[in-house]
Amino acid sequence: MSPCVNSSVQCATRKSLPNMMIRRFLSSAAYDATLNTLKRDLKTAMMQKKAVEKNTVKSVIAAIKGAEIDGSKQDEFALFKTLSKMHKQRVQSASEYASQNRDDLAQVEQAEAGIIERYLQSLPVASSAQVQDKLRQFCSQVQSQEGEVPMKKVFGMVGEVVGEWNTSMELVRPLVPGVYKEVWGDKKK
């Protein structure tokens, strides 16, 4: 009799454990370094009894682990996406609290946003402004060489060079339509 017959929980755990371990080895060096930094900072915040920093770092680690379980890539671009989302949420919450005259809560959210921003800046990923500048230069170059190009083709061309820009296609994709309209005008192709 197999040890998994009596407990479906054990079976699920045993089956998924090797996949999780394999995925863990596929993470990038920047991903691992950031995770180690977060764990070290959590320990420091706990020893120094910094409640806001401790809670923020715990929530960041939980979000990263949640993304790992969901099967997302384990690289600096996935971290950037997760941290950007968390930062945006904190900034929005702070402005909502401030508009409702809850300055105490707004200050906590702003402090959390600052902590998350510190980790965002430590990642070796190009900022949105840098990516937009590179995209604008790239589209201008394509326009001068090839003239009118459909947006679909621009997406394909950008996909080939996106790795050189130190970003991911996921981060570039929403910027392409705006830059396309700047360079080629408001033509839909």
Curated annotation (Swiss-Prot):
InterPro entries: Asn/Gln_tRNA_amidoTrase-B-like, YqeY/Aim41, YqeY/Aim41_N. GO terms for molecular function: carbon-nitrogen ligase activity, with glutamine as amido-N-donor. It comes from the Eukaryota. Keywords: Mitochondrion, Transit peptide. It is found in: Mitochondrion. It holds the Pfam family YqeY. Residues 1-32 form a transit peptide. One of its GO terms (cellular component) is mitochondrion. Belongs to the AIM41 family. This is Altered inheritance of mitochondria protein 41, mitochondrial. It comes from Meyerozyma guilliermondii (strain ATCC 6260 / CBS 566 / DSM 6381 / JCM 1539 / NBRC 10279 / NRRL Y-324) (Yeast).
